[in-house]
């Protein structure tokens, strides 16, 4: 049964979409260098078998071929399990998970195309779906992942399948007294606090885990042990027992994975206090991988705006310098225009004076010719003197 479960939850069927796969070692084989299903088929020939499509009953030799067939023929969208939104492509899903939920890695279920923010949640999801079909597939020679009962994905609250195994985990008597006395690798996972508990059977793989299930949620440092105890004792979740699965009601409208991530933050905070006491004084940080994408975009826009402002200031300074030079040139031109106007006025006066003198000379010449004194030398000399005096425009100094 263990070997069959390994085939059901092989890396080919739990390949993460959008981001590179982590280095995983299952059954002693490294599959970190594989891309899609072809590399795994070459390195793991034991995964070859009969994979039947539960919708059209076609049989495929490899699980990757079955997954590709499901996505191309039957399922045209991916589902975000955080906000329960249907998305058309894996690239759009990756962008949505990073921008809307600040999740940099996602893990896909090849059966229903749901995107999980944590690999442990994907394993719980697949294990729960597989346990519901073990009784129906014991005598079937076909590998059962292709015929998983898809009714588990028709539940109104799909996260009941994830929380059901967690409700039966042991709770320590006192979080304050038990955490410092135990080594890091042996700290148990605290169960969700509820007044009524159901009694489902805990899966063997979950009970034998050597350490808490890892999570991609940011780890926050607790301020004090009393604060941790108050947060653990706070009754945030109420459960009630039903014949099929436990129904969970939340106080707020937050998603189910948000509640699980907040519970794991309480588990992670004592580990930091035990390993390094000095880290409690530092402020809570978020990994650079989980930086806000909107912050990067806003910072880039601010830098572009600052560069534009500097360029505009430089242009304004240049235009002010040019305006000062233009004002100086205008002042010089105004002085030149005034000087030219004065010269024109002086030339106009000289022209008028010359015209008057010319008219006087003409009158004197006409009078001299009318008197018939041209033969008298003395009269001629006096006439010439008068004519010369009239032609002088300015008086000598």
Curated annotation (Swiss-Prot):
PROSITE patterns recorded: ZINC_FINGER_C2H2_1 (PS00028), ZINC_FINGER_C2H2_2 (PS50157)
Q: Has keyword Ion transport?
A: no
The record's Pfam families line, in alphabetical order, gives: zf-C2H2
Q: GO terms for molecular function, please?
A: DNA-binding transcription factor activity, RNA polymerase II-specific; transcription cis-regulatory region binding; zinc ion binding
| Stretch list, region Disordered | 1-40
Any keyword Ribosomal protein?
Answer: no
Q: Which organism is it from?
A: Caenorhabditis elegans
Name any GO cellular component annotation.
nucleus
Spell out the Acidic residues composition-biased ranges: 14-27
Q: Provide the protein name.
A: Zinc finger transcription factor family protein 30
* TM stretches of this protein: none
The compartments listed are: Nucleus
């Amino acid at each position: 049964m263990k070997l069959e479960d390994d085939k059901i939850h092989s890396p080919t069927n739990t390949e993460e979409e959008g981001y590179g796969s982590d280095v995983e070692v299952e059954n002693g084989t490294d599959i970190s260098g594989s891309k899609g299903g072809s590399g795994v088929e070459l390195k793991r020939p034991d995964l070859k078998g009969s994979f039947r499509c539960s919708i059209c009953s076609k049989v495929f030799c490899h699980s990757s071929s079955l997954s590709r067939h499901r996505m191309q023929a039957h399922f045209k969208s991916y589902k975000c399990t955080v906000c329960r939104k249907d998305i058309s492509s894996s690239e759009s899903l990756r962008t949505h998970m990073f921008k809307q939920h600040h999740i940099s890695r996602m893990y896909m279920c090849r059966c229903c195309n749901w995107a999980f923010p944590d690999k442990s949640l994907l394993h719980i999801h697949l294990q729960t779906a597989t346990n519901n079909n073990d009784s129906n597939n014991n005598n079937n020679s076909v590998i059962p992942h292709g015929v998983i009962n898809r009714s588990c994905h028709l539940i109104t609250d799909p996260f009941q399948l994830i929380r059901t195994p967690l409700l039966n985990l042991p709770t320590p008597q006192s979080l304050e007294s038990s955490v410092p006395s135990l080594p890091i690798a042996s700290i148990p996972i605290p169960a969700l606090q509820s007044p009524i508990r159901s009694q489902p059977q805990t899966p063997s793989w979950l009970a034998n885990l050597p350490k808490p299930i890892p999570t991609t949620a940011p780890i926050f440092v607790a301020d004090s042990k009393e604060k941790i105890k108050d947060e653990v004792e706070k009754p945030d979740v109420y459960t009630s027992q039903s014949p099929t699965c436990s129904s969970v009601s939340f106080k707020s409208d937050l998603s189910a994975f948000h509640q699980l991530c907040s519970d794991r933050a309480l588990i992670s905070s004592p580990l930091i206090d035990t390993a390094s006491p000095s880290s409690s004084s530092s402020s809570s940080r978020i990994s650079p991988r989980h930086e806000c994408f909107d912050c990067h975009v806003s910072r880039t826009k601010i830098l572009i705006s600052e560069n534009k402002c500097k360029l505009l200031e430089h242009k304004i300074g240049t235009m002010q310098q040019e305006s000062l030079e233009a004002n100086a040139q205008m002042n010089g031109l105004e002085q030149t225009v005034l000087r030219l106007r004065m010269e024109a006025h002086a030339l106009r006066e000289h022209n008028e004076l010359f015209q008057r003198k010319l008219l006087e000379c003409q009158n004197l010449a006409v009078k001299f010719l009318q008197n018939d004194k041209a033969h008298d030398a003395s009269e001629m000399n006096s006439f010439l003197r008068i004519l010369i005096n009239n032609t002088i425009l300015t008086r000598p100094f």
